[in-house]
Amino acid sequence: MFLAIDIGNTNIVLGIYDKGKLIKTWRMAADRNKTVDEYAVLIHNFFSFINLSFKDIEGIGIASVVPPLTPIFEQLCYNYFKVKPLVIGPGVRTGLKIKFENPREVGADRIVNAVAGYHIYGGPLIVVDFGTATTFDAINDKGEYIGGAISPGIGISTEALFARASKLPRIELVKPLSVIGKNTVSAMQAGIIYGFIGQVDEICARMKKELGGAAKVIATGGLAELIATDSRQIEKVDQNLTLEGIRLIYERNQAGN
């Protein structure tokens, strides 16, 4: 079996693959203060739900955008799984040509999304990932990663609003019935949700134009469903895109050994 580990700033997502098929995913908070052993206990508990043990895992791939957590999970793989993980980064075979001024600046999450997106949906393609930051990544019809855009994510944007505007209450991020709010809560929900929908649609429309007008738009990440339902640009939500990219890159590197 194969274990894909997606380490983000807010959450860590685990995916178990059996013969190339995703059979289970789990999500846990990304905590830089946790030790190797503490994370091992959490993973062991997850595994116990499906009668899985550490020794069942034959390969591990890691995509991380949190440098302090990367060595913790590498050590966890050595200590508990007795497996050397593939950490996706510079020097790893991805099968993706990166046409970026400095390819090393492109985050592992964006690379794996691009790899999986092009493999599954073809190109030209735009991948929108709703994480701590909202990222937009463009892949042309040749399967080349040509760049993208990064904006503050919905979560950190709303946190900034709550922190700076002391009279505004904390709210649940749900779509209001109307864009014209009738109270403070619904007005905030309208501004945040429809504001982000507008941002996504505008950036994607401009990217499509630069890509030649026919690009597909695929979304992933925690709040993708919330935004996609009213977006004029997003065609599909694929919540397993990042895990699938980790698996694909791992397999490409195994094939080359």
From Swiss-Prot:
User: Which reaction is catalysed here?
Assistant: (R)-pantothenate + ATP = (R)-4'-phosphopantothenate + ADP + H(+)
The catalytic activity of this protein is classed by the Enzyme Commission as 2.7.1.33
Q: Which GO terms describe its cellular component?
A: cytoplasm
Molecular functions per Gene Ontology: ATP binding; metal ion binding; pantothenate kinase activity
Task: From the UniProt record, give one GO term of the biological process aspect.
Answer: coenzyme A biosynthetic process
What residues make up the catalytic site?
Answer: 109 (proton acceptor)
InterPro entries annotated for this entry? ATPase_NBD, Type_III_PanK
Q: Which residues bind ATP?
A: 6-13, 132
Query: Which top-level enzyme class is recorded in the Swiss-Prot or TrEMBL entry?
Result: transferase
Binding-site residues, substrate: 100, 107-110, 184
Write out the annotated subcellular location: Cytoplasm
Keywords (alphabetical) are: ATP-binding, Coenzyme A biosynthesis, Cytoplasm, Kinase, Metal-binding, Nucleotide-binding, Potassium, Transferase
Q: Give the cofactor binding note.
A: A monovalent cation. Ammonium or potassium.
Q: In which pathway does it act?
A: Cofactor biosynthesis; coenzyme A biosynthesis; CoA from (R)-pantothenate: step 1/5
Give cofactor(s), names only.
NH4(+); K(+)
Annotated signal peptide: none
Residues involved in K(+) binding = 129
What SUPFAM superfamilies does the record tag this protein with? Actin-like ATPase domain (SSF53067)
Q: Which NCBIfam families match?
A: baf (TIGR00671), PRK13318.1-5 (NF009847), PRK13318.1-6 (NF009848), PRK13321.1 (NF009855)
Q: Which PANTHER family match?
A: TYPE III PANTOTHENATE KINASE
Task: State the function annotated in the UniProt record.
Answer: Catalyzes the phosphorylation of pantothenate (Pan), the first step in CoA biosynthesis.
The similarity annotation says: Belongs to the type III pantothenate kinase family.
Q: How does it assemble?
A: Homodimer.
What is this protein's name?
Answer: Type III pantothenate kinase
Native organism: Carboxydothermus hydrogenoformans (strain ATCC BAA-161 / DSM 6008 / Z-2901)
